Amino acid sequence: MTTQASTFAVAVPSVATPFRRHRNPFVVRAQAEPSDKSVEIMRKFSEQYARKSGTYFCVDKGVTSVVIKGLADHKDTLGAPLCPCRHYDDKAAEVAQGFWNCPCVPMRERKECHCMLFLTPDNDFAGNEQTITLDEIKESTANM
């Protein structure tokens, strides 16, 4: 026997039903990955911008990989590479405003990248590379 919870519109087991372990029904998991084309576009953009700005990727290429995939996902879903490291109440409005589209205004004006994608040489987390391969991105993010 189940009752309908009107607030959330989900079935709730009655008290008589024994407790069963199931995944949390309120957890939403993303199913889609960004397209390989968008990941490649954002990879190339990131390499070019690092060279142009005199910045470097994080010594942990996993950080670089996750950010590039986040940018690619936003490029696919929003049409622009909105910074994936921030919370937005309205992503579409943020894309239209352009402030947080990569490279964001703080990066362009002061070389401050919140995502740690573009790091100045004096940053403790900066590596010495301005390149990353598509295979490195796939390998770093395979189990995520």
UniProtKB/Swiss-Prot annotation:
It is found in: Plastid, Chloroplast. It is an enzyme of class 1 (oxidoreductase). GO terms for cellular component: chloroplast. It holds the Pfam family FeThRed_B. The active site is at C85 (nucleophile). SUPFAM superfamilies: Ferredoxin thioredoxin reductase (FTR), catalytic beta chain. The record marks H114 as: Increases the nucleophilicity of the active site Cys. Its EC number is 1.8.7.2. It comes from Glycine max. GO terms for molecular function: 4 iron, 4 sulfur cluster binding; electron transfer activity; ferredoxin-thioredoxin reductase activity; metal ion binding; oxidoreductase activity, acting on iron-sulfur proteins as donors. Keywords: 4Fe-4S, Chloroplast, Disulfide bond, Iron, Iron-sulfur, Metal-binding, Oxidoreductase, Plastid, Redox-active center, Transit peptide. Binds 1 [4Fe-4S] cluster. It comes from the Eukaryota. Heterodimer of subunit A (variable subunit) and subunit B (catalytic subunit). Heterodimeric FTR forms a complex with ferredoxin and thioredoxin. Disulfide bonds join C85-C115. Catalytic subunit of the ferredoxin-thioredoxin reductase (FTR), which catalyzes the two-electron reduction of thioredoxins by the electrons provided by reduced ferredoxin. Residues 1-31 form a transit peptide. Its cofactor is [4Fe-4S] cluster. It catalyses: [thioredoxin]-disulfide + 2 reduced [2Fe-2S]-[ferredoxin] + 2 H(+) = [thioredoxin]-dithiol + 2 oxidized [2Fe-2S]-[ferredoxin]. Belongs to the ferredoxin thioredoxin reductase beta subunit family. Its main location: plastid. This is Ferredoxin-thioredoxin reductase catalytic chain, chloroplastic. [4Fe-4S] cluster binds at C83, C102, C104, C113.
